[in-house]
């Protein structure tokens, strides 16, 4: 650590303000970033302040995301606070992040990625295949709903908004017989035992950037840039470069069922992607391999290949 860097480290008198949503999972993620920075720079807990910011997506629970504004509903107020100087960094679940950041902000720091798989959660059924004909399944994810409709068109799919705890309570109340959650979130909350088990990616390709935590900052803040460089996980960044370029080319939002996963194999990246009709009547999968250095171009190329196979009105 340089002497200049030492003078700019957070301290109890000038703590680093970490902006986050207020759900238990979001708070865990914010504190994980704090723990990583404490370990990397030998800092006390008092050198940080976690700032909870209410976002529209958490306040409106009775409507589908696509009907009230999509992914930006989970980030807009936090990014406004970052731009206004009310916080110094913002911690996000990357699968909730729009592909483009507002002018003045950059997202270039990621923690090591967690389990990317979806989890099958049901009080009374062990596997998806064991659900009876016509069973009610809750999900707010267009991707999961389309993938389920493709594999099990007999299922009744109902909207299932809310944080992990809210959705588990809905299951207990009998609103649905099963739901799907990200294994990463369950692992982080110490709730992995609530899942019947993970669903392998060959059966259900996950959301782009699922399991990844991203840290957003102001472009002009060189002090924070130096701090975050000390905890950035390069391999996760490389994987997300491919996945988010894939999503960007597809104009991905909460209105389009898109799945994608990049895996590093030696000096290569293997990117798998899938686009689906919202009603689950058609899926167009694909995959490409290429050098890690070309990760973003790989994502763009795979998206173009899938779009070329999609008929007009595919996402409608």
Please name every model-derived segment.
Residues 85, 133, 174:
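Structured loop/turn residues at beta-strand edges in well-structured enzyme cores
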Residues 2-54, 59-60, 67, 75, ...:
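Small-molecule-sensing regulatory modules
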Residues 73, 81-83, 92, 97-102:
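Extracytoplasmic loops/domains of multi-pass membrane proteins
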Residues 94-97, 103-155:
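A conserved helix-loop-strand patch within extracytoplasmic ligand-binding domains
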Residues 62-88:
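Short, structured active-site "lid" loops
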Residues 87-91, 177-178:
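Short, Asp-centered acidic motifs that coordinate Mg2+ and/or phosphate
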């Amino acid at each position: 650590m340089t002497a200049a860097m030492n003078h700019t480290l957070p301290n109890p008198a000038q703590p680093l303000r970490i902006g986050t949503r207020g759900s238990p999972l979001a708070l865990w993620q914010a504190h994980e970033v704090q723990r990583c920075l404490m370990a990397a720079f030998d800092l006390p807990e008092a050198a940080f302040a976690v700032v909870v910011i209410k976002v529209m997506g958490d306040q409106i629970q009775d409507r589908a995301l696509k009907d009230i504004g999509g992914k930006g509903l989970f980030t807009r107020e936090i990014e406004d606070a970052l731009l206004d100087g009310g916080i110094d960094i913002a911690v996000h679940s990357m699968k909730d992040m729009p592909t483009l950041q507002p002018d003045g902000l950059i997202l270039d720091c990621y923690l090591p990625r967690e389990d990317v798989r979806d989890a099958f959660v049901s009080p009374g059924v062990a596997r998806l295949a064991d659900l009876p004909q016509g069973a009610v399944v809750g999900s707010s994810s267009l991707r999961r709903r389309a993938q389920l409709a493709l594999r099990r068109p007999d299922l009744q799919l109902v909207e299932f908004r809310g944080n992990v705890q809210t959705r588990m309570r809905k299951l207990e109340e009998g609103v649905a017989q099963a739901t799907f959650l990200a294994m990463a979130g369950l692992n982080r909350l110490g709730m992995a035992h609530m899942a019947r088990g993970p669903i392998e990616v060959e059966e259900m390709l996950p959301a782009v950037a699922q399991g990844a935590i991203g840290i957003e900052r102001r472009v002009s803040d060189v002090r924070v840039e130096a701090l975050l460089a000390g905890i950035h996980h390069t391999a996760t960044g490389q994987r997300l470069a491919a996945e988010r370029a894939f999503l960007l080319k597809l104009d991905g939002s909460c209105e389009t069922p898109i799945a994608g996963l990049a895996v590093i194999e030696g000096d290569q990246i293997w990117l798998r992607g899938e686009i689906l009709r919202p009603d689950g009547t058609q899926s167009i999968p694909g995959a490409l391999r290429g050098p890690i250095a070309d990760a973003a171009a790989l994502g763009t190329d795979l998206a173009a290949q899938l779009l070329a196979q999609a008929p007009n009105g595919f996402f409608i």
